[in-house]
């Protein structure tokens, strides 16, 4: 597993600190946003994808509550899941299927606390080779990464549109998203089931396009990108710090919603990408803290019905997702935040 550690005082562009409030956003009148009397150190898993770009600001916002965040960079959500389940991390954001996959393997130490948004995952074809409807998928060679949220959305869309996934020309792509682009350019595949910034790279380089069809609007999964989750041991021992983390997260998402272009620049800097690529990736993403429990249950059922997990955990997932911290941080009801949606 390839990880890179960053210090708790992550440096950001000067413009960010100039715009950031110097005190917690809701002021001292809200008990959930008061500064902790003693500092609490936290390890946060971070994957460098555009949908998670607001989380680059989490250390800076959490520091206002006396929570000291150290970010650890991961290349794959699966590795973040393993680290959070084991307690090597206290907080992480990964695919909405990851807590379910953990439960299927007997890991009960991860608790989902907030949503991240929608979009981000994408389909990509060579320019001029559009796929206008799902019937047009059948003859194509399709590059996928089994287990990824983009793959899950695609597999659900295939079923909902009357195709037999088992009869498709599936090509398993190993490694990172760059390998999908190489395979697509090299005509080893005709469609990549991938995610940003890799779609954005193909688009801005001029050789690729999005097909007319999309896999981000299925009844089973919807457009969910990721879930923010806590390690249960950390959550139980440090509930007040956990609340401050979620409150800080809500604050940074509000900043991202207000100024997506600013976050495109942050993402470009952190990922070492051209700003045009980052801007295209962010354009495809909608930041949102709500978390649809119905979608999570639908994902669990889909994974079981299709043999990805050996045990049906759809009836258990609710107890591994809590709206307590998010409701306090936003002042909204759990039902409004997705518990009944």
Features from the language model and the residues they span:
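Short polybasic/polar patches that bind polyanions
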Residues: 63, 103, 159, 203, ...
